[in-house]
Amino acid sequence: MNLSKIHHIAIIVSDYEAAKDFYVNKLGFSVIRENYRPERKDWKLDLRVNEYTELEIFAEENPPKRVNRPEACGLRHLAFCVESVEQTVNELAEVGIECEPIRVDDYTGKKMTFFHDSDGLPLELHE
């Protein structure tokens, strides 16, 4: 078996326009496809993260609230690899996104921090 790359990660959001603004206009992901699915009454937005990975965003009417405890079963957070955590934190601040204080990962020895998307999903920056 050769599972070489992650093709996509799918998330459900509560506010389609807020999520689209966050991931496209603030994080800079490009739109691949955007579709309203009337039979499901939801939006599906496919975004290019890099040459290998896509982020699928689903926005449906009245989704259940996200469990507020990150240790609940399921997706805990998304982590993005960056060359410089400091530079990326500064770039995020320029578009109004606050990050936690930068710290060193106890296991990798690399700099890291967290911020949150428009629904409170934790997003990590990791060198």
Predicted features along the sequence, with ranges:
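A short, acidic/glycine-rich surface segment
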Residues: 32-34, 41-43, 62-68, 101
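Core segments of cupin and vicinal oxygen chelate
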Residues: 12-54, 94
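Mid-chain, well-packed structural core segment of small domains
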Residues: 71-86
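Vicinal oxygen chelate
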Residues: 2, 35, 46, 89-127
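Short, charged/polar surface micro-motifs in flexible loops or helix N-caps
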Residues: 50-54, 62-63, 85
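N-terminal beta-strand motif that seeds the catalytic metal site of vicinal oxygen chelate
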Residues: 1-18, 75-78
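Short amphipathic alpha-helices within nucleic acid-binding modules
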Residues: 22, 86-91
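Exposed loop/turn and edge beta-strand positions of beta-sandwich/beta-sheet ligand-binding modules
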Residues: 41, 74, 109
